[in-house]
């Protein structure tokens, strides 16, 4: 009779006992799985650390200038915790190699900057999208309700600003060594400016012997704006309106400058057409602008008058160029040489370049810059170059690659000297600076003896033989190509 009887709760207690019994191995397996995951994570981090160490001995592949800020210490997804780079907008990074789609390996260009993990453009874009989504979810209702009460900008203007903000690339590819460009005290092509700059070129050639490349650039680098290089319509207009430089010539010069920078030597450009920092502001060169500054306009006038009647004819245009430069805010220049003595100005510039040299050269031994960015798979599709919101030209994608044509153009740039008349200065151009900054380096750069007017005249210590009768002088370069 008891076989068929039902005891309440018996089956439940048996089932409960079975569940409690079988749950113990489940907990153990969860712990074991967690340990396996932690072990795998440590193994991956160890391999990443080893790759980070090996990268110290690898050459620089390419360089970028940042357009955003980033704190690697706070990024928990960094392959090695605490090994992410920190940078602000407008900093420079040397990229060694690609670690993954989200991470590169490289270093911040500064003294003591160590090898670290650098977020790729895809990684930064992902972070930006997450931040935007988080901001939208945590939007303040009160602030949203106030939008209707505010005066909003015109839709077209708002859309334009939004489009610009959306297309800001996190990085711009730049030369691995920022080229040095001298401007001032006035216009290149006139004796005062040419000979003050020539004294500095000679000093740099000897001071940094074996570590520097000084090259003349006759093409108008101000045409190397990304908006022009990427827009065929603008190219046609520019080429029709400019007899000085074709876009192809400018592209060739940009490639040559990138090639020179691959050696990680200092690169100094004797750029005929560059007389103002604004001319290079929208290019991919990211130059070091050095302002050779005369103490006062009276000193400059005295120096120009000392050069004879030929230079006096163009006193006004030289003074206008001087005024344009001194009106620039100090942040427009990387170095301002306002010393009265040549020795002091030279040492000032040398100190800056020595610091830059140490910042760009990691103490770890290794070969020079060899690999182009094309060596990193998929890099050329990331559109690091170009003006905001525009596609990038083949030049900018390939400018870091070795080029036989670029090498040939660098040799041809030194063959023969161009004949140009200073009358270009009096012509009117639509561009705000072109009326002052036309190329006119056709003067013979003889070296004058120092006059006794001002200590700054010592920057003009050259021969006193000049021919002031011909307005269309051909400018002989004061140093040959072979001297480099």
From Swiss-Prot:
Cell inner membrane listed as a keyword = no
Principal localization reads cytoplasm
The record's tissue-specificity note reads:
Expressed mostly in brain, colon and ovary.
Where does it live in the cell?
Cytoplasm
UniProt key word Calcium: yes
Q: How does it assemble?
A: Component of a calcium channel complex consisting of a pore-forming alpha subunit (CACNA1C) and the ancillary subunits CACNB3 and CACNA2D1. The channel complex contains alpha, beta, gamma and delta subunits in a 1:1:1:1 ratio. Interacts with CACNA2D4. Interacts with FASLG. Interacts with CBARP; prevents the interaction of CACNB3 with the alpha subunit CACNA1C thereby negatively regulating the activity of the corresponding calcium channel.
Q: Which family does it belong to?
A: Belongs to the calcium channel beta subunit family.
- According to UniProt, the name of this protein is Voltage-dependent L-type calcium channel subunit beta-3
